[in-house]
Regions:
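Catalytic-core signature of thiol
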Residues: 1-235
């Protein structure tokens, strides 16, 4: 049984557009950001948001090692962000992003609105947290480990994008290493774009440190990697 649990974010005019962080062109056409542990497993819980946050931290270029328990804890922190502790009805990508910022995982997050922004980020900067509808056909990658959004909609799901080759994007979901290849799969650019335009979301953030969500929030100052990362982004 695969758990889902992504809710659509409500509009917020304060959101940063990812386009504001793209300042240069690139000739890179292929990139797969390393994910060096077994994919985490949310089991049949609606905790995909918390697990996507954990996967985002695990994935290069600035990896932090998180566990299944971290994924569950991050989900509960999302509930705390929304003022609904203990709720088991999923979470939104914006709440995931706000929670990561509150916990000190990143200081900046921005929403992509176009495929060109998503592709640029995957090829040059790192992975993105995404939220889309998940259809019944997507539960079964084909012989080439490609998923297809066919069949009825099973629900909303948060997952990670961590790679790009011509015509395809690579994703990782939080159903353990037995789904696809270590939780990973490919989806065509065309089919991902169709999902994205059906209330899909994609968020990029700048990681700053490993965070254990079970530890009380540190209200003090911290030295982060944000400055170097922003300098790299804007050239």
């Amino acid at each position: 049984m695969y758990g889902l649990g992504r809710n659509v974010s409500t509009f917020d005019r304060r959101d940063y557009p990812l386009s504001a962080f793209i300042r240069r062109t690139t000739d890179v056409t292929e990139k797969l950001w390393a994910f060096e542990v077994d994919a985490l497993n949310q089991l049949d819980t609606p905790h995909c948001g918390g697990f996507t946050m954990a996967h985002y931290g695990i994935c290069h270029p600035m990896p932090s090692m998180y566990t299944n328990q971290n994924g569950h804890d991050f989900y509960e922190q999302c509930n705390i962000t929304d003022g609904t502790p203990g709720l088991q009805s999923g979470t939104s990508c914006r709440t995931m992003a706000k929670t990561g910022k509150r916990l000190g995982m990143w200081s900046v997050y921005a929403f992509a609105t176009r495929m060109a922004e998503i592709d640029y980020w995957l090829l040059n900067e790192g992975s993105l947290m995404v939220g889309t509808e998940w259809t019944m056909g997507m539960f079964a990658p084909d012989a080439n480990n490609i998923i297809h959004p066919t069949g009825s909609i099973a629900g909303g799901h948060a997952w990670l994008l961590n790679g790009k080759i011509p015509g395809f994007k690579h994703g990782i979901t939080s159903w353990g290493p037995d789904f696809g290849i270590n939780g990973g799969f490919w989806i065509s650019d065309t089919e991902f774009e169709a999902l994205f335009h059906q209330q899909g979301e994609a968020i990029a953030a700048v990681e700053v440190a490993k965070v254990d969500p079970s530890v009380p929030e540190n209200k003090g100052c911290a030295t982060t990697k944000l400055g170097k990362a922003l300098k790299r982004m804007i050239g």
